[in-house]
Amino acid sequence: MHALGRTLALMLLIFITILVPESSCSVKGREEIPPDDSFPFSDDNIFPDGVGVTMEIEIITPVSVQIGIKAQLFCHPSPSKEATLRIWEITPRDWPSCRLPYRAELQQISKKICTERGTTRVPAHHQSSDLPIKSMALKHDGHYSCRIETTDGIFQERHSIQVPGENRTVVCEAIASKPAMQILWTPDEDCVTKSKSHNDTMIVRSKCHREKNNGHSVFCFISHLTDNWILSMEQNRGTTSILPSLLSILYVKLAVTVLIVGFAFFQKRNYFSSRDLVFMKERRSKRSVWQREALG
């Protein structure tokens, strides 16, 4: 019955919000890099074999762009007027890379070469080598490189775009009778768990910061002497409350407890009723014997 009392005292509150990692800065500078097979644009159909080229790379400090605004990424003119090919390489943080070739003879960005949907779309018959983004979203967070092939060499300009979103935090809180509950996370990242005592109850609160919002579920494991719980939450749904589910569990346990207590009460009542009945029969039997003895 003591364990049942602890179960009745159990209350769980769990909620989830979303957190995006802080912005970071890269170094600005220029350097020469020889051609490498591992470079994403070293395709034979774009750069013929045996051609010695010089790479000039300019790394731009990351730019923070708010969600929902319109953006335009510029591909600056090359030192030479003989720019025959320009290619945008888009590498979102949570998507595979995508290429957008700009053909000088066509004066428009050709059909994109992508391995996954969800990347930047270019309007049909776009007459500029600049890359427009109609409405910035979290999926546009990543690196954008404009690569130019000229008679003087190959030039590349890089943009690092950061799209801050809402806070991405997962919190699991449990309130129960002593001893304190144990809370574990999967996956376990940057988590801090604190507990405090209030009268005969213990409040345990665990908070985890997620560096990436990949949409995968986060599991909170809650362990107590009375029972164990496994709660699943999805990061990409924003604020989520599973209190109705927990209330359903508590209602079921309360109903079971009431049935057990009621059954025990009726059993005890039947026991005392039977004992009283036997006692009354014995008293009546003894009284009859006394009356017979008195008459005899």
From Swiss-Prot:
Keywords: Disulfide bond, Glycoprotein, Immunoglobulin domain, Membrane, Repeat, Signal, Transmembrane, Transmembrane helix. Residues 151-232 form the Ig-like C2-type domain. One of its GO terms (molecular function) is signaling receptor activity. Expressed in uterus and bone marrow-derived mast cells (at protein level). Expressed in uterus, spleen, bone marrow-derived dendritic, basophil and mast cells. Expressed in the lung of N.brasiliensis-infected mice. Weakly expressed in brain, testis, lung and thymus. Residues 1-25 form the signal peptide. The keyword Calcium does not apply. PROSITE patterns: IG_LIKE (PS50835). The chain crosses the membrane at residues 246-266. According to PubMed:15187158 isoform 4 is a receptor for the CD200 cell surface glycoprotein. According to PubMed:16081818 isoform 4 is not a receptor for the CD200/OX2 cell surface glycoprotein. Isoform 1, isoform 2 and isoform 3 are involved in the recruitment or surface expression of the TYROBP receptor. Isoform 6, isoform 7 and isoform 8 are not involved in the recruitment or surface expression of the TYROBP receptor. Isoform 3 interacts with TYROBP. Isoform 8 does not interact with TYROBP. This is Cell surface glycoprotein CD200 receptor 3. It comes from Mus musculus (Mouse). The lineage of its organism: Eukaryota, Metazoa, Chordata, Craniata, Vertebrata. The gene is Cd200r3.
